[in-house]
């Protein structure tokens, strides 16, 4: 009877084993996929040779649904795009409507928008930094950063009544004013709790040897490649390009704010995390300026063709009640035209191309998601890396599929 050794091939008897290429599915049911992403990967052993991302598993036809709603009814759809930073999505949409209407927004409303847009940025980065650190093997920082995120959600709830899907930014301003106690609480939080929790959490991993080994020189993108792939937000800033729409094309009161644009040097995963960490500090700086400079005054435009009458007025005036009913059923008519508005959302440039035919509903609303252009570079960034590095690269992109798939 032949021994096991005799049945082996000559190559195997010499101790040489040929590693064959094979194809695997990463996701869509995978905790590190950050949503319903399916990546078809071709591997040579553990080295990634090709990545083919399959998107669209969360496609809900948002752009088409918006065409059947009035301008105000379409607003909550934007909260459900990037559901980790909903107010960042609303911002582009309301600015686009205001540009078509040539609507003047009161100064207090602009300050409130900037305040909560930056709170949204902090909220988003807590989720991304925490989950990124957990994806590469650390648990504690994620739990600490989620305490800050919980504080942010509580502030959203106190301002709008909803923790996530706020629908608080409205054409002409914001839905309702915030109580003074909320503003003082946010100020106290920025001075004490936020820096303490945040810096403690960052100190656990920023200079950690294992964290650096998992992120430094992983998924490197040069300045030229970042521009060629259409990167924006922390992705392009990590590559060393100081591009920020809040500085280059300021909207609301960003032109009055004093803040720095953090940039990286290598364009790797470590730089992307560090850029987001510094962005949190800069956001806190902007919020403090908003709190100290915010004037008294109306929180929505005085144009009654767009903004509904006040609740007290409706109790006294039949005309105000009819006016309110008309605004919330028929909606307001927007002059014919088209406009593209982009804002600096926490993940990058979020754009809305809005086409009006003069009716009360958008003729077309094209949404420019931030992560779509980042995902197209997956093959470019992951090629030649180990399979374990793919989770770090994907997490550092910061992708949410509600926004990507629309």
From Swiss-Prot:
This entry's Enzyme Commission designation comes to: 7.1.1.-
GO CC entries: plasma membrane
Q: Which UniProt keywords apply?
A: Cell inner membrane, Cell membrane, Membrane, NAD, Quinone, Translocase, Transport, Ubiquinone
Q: How does it sit in the membrane?
A: Peripheral membrane protein
Top enzyme class, one word, equals translocase
> InterPro entries from the xrefs?
NADH_Q_OxRdtase_suD (IPR001135), NADH_UbQ_OxRdtase_49kDa_CS (IPR014029), NDH1_su_D/H (IPR022885), NiFe-Hase_large (IPR029014)
Report the catalytic activity. Answer: a quinone + NADH + 5 H(+)(in) = a quinol + NAD(+) + 4 H(+)(out)
| Coiled coil region boundaries | none
- Localization: Cell inner membrane
A GO molecular function annotation here is:
NADH:ubiquinone reductase (non-electrogenic) activity
Whom does it interact with, and what assembly results?
A: NDH-1 is composed of 14 different subunits. Subunits NuoB, C, D, E, F, and G constitute the peripheral sector of the complex.
Q: Which family does it belong to?
A: Belongs to the complex I 49 kDa subunit family.
Q: What's its job?
A: NDH-1 shuttles electrons from NADH, via FMN and iron-sulfur (Fe-S) centers, to quinones in the respiratory chain. The immediate electron acceptor for the enzyme in this species is believed to be ubiquinone. Couples the redox reaction to proton translocation (for every two electrons transferred, four hydrogen ions are translocated across the cytoplasmic membrane), and thus conserves the redox energy in a proton gradient.
This protein's name = NADH-quinone oxidoreductase subunit D
Specify the species.
Rhizorhabdus wittichii (strain DSM 6014 / CCUG 31198 / JCM 15750 / NBRC 105917 / EY 4224 / RW1) (Sphingomonas wittichii)
Q: What is the lineage of its organism?
A: Bacteria, Pseudomonadati, Pseudomonadota, Alphaproteobacteria, Sphingomonadales
What gene is this protein translated from?
nuoD
């Amino acid at each position: 009877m032949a021994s096991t050794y005799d049945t082996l091939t000559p190559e195997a008897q010499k101790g040489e084993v040929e590693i064959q290429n094979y194809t695997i599915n990463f996701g869509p049911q995978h905790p590190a996929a950050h949503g319903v992403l399916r990546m078809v990967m071709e591997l040579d052993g553990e080295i990634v040779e090709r990545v083919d991302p399959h998107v669209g598993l969360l496609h809900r036809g948002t752009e088409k649904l918006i065409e059947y709603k009035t301008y105000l009814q379409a607003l909550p759809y934007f909260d459900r795009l990037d559901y980790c930073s909903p107010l960042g999505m609303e911002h582009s949409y309301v600015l686009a409507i205001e540009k078509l209407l040539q609507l003047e927004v009161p100064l207090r409303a602009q300050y409130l928008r900037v305040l909560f847009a930056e709170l949204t940025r902090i909220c988003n980065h807590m989720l991304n930094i925490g989950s990124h650190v957990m994806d590469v093997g650390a648990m504690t920082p994620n739990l600490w950063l989620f305490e800050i995120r919980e504080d942010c959600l509580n502030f959203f709830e106190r301002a709008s009544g909803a923790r996530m899907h706020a629908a608080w930014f409205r054409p002409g301003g914001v839905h309702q004013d915030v109580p003074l106690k909320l503003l003082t609480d946010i100020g106290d939080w920025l001075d004490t709790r936020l820096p303490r929790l945040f810096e403690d959490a960052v100190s656990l991993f920023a200079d950690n040897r294992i964290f650096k080994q998992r992120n430094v020189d992983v998924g490197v993108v040069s300045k030229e490649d970042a521009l060629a792939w259409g990167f924006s937000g922390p992705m392009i800033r990590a590559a060393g390009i100081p591009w920020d729409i809040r500085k280059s094309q300021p909207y609301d009161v960003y032109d009055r704010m004093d803040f720095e644009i953090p940039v990286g040097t290598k364009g790797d995963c470590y730089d992307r995390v560090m850029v987001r960490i510094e962005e949190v500090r800069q956001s806190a700086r902007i919020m403090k300026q908003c709190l100290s400079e915010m004037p008294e005054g109306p929180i929505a435009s005085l144009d009654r063709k767009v903004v509904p009458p006040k609740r007290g007025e409706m109790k006294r005036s039949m005309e105000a009640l009819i006016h309110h009913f008309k605004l919330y059923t028929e909606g307001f008519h927007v002059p014919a035209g088209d406009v593209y508005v982009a804002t600096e959302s926490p993940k990058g440039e979020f754009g809305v191309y809005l086409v009006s035919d003069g009716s009360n509903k958008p003729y077309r609303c094209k949404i420019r998601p931030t992560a779509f252009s980042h995902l197209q570079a997956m093959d470019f960034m992951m090629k030649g890396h180990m399979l374990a590095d793919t989770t770090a690269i994907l997490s550092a992109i910061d992708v949410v599929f509600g926004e990507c798939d629309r």
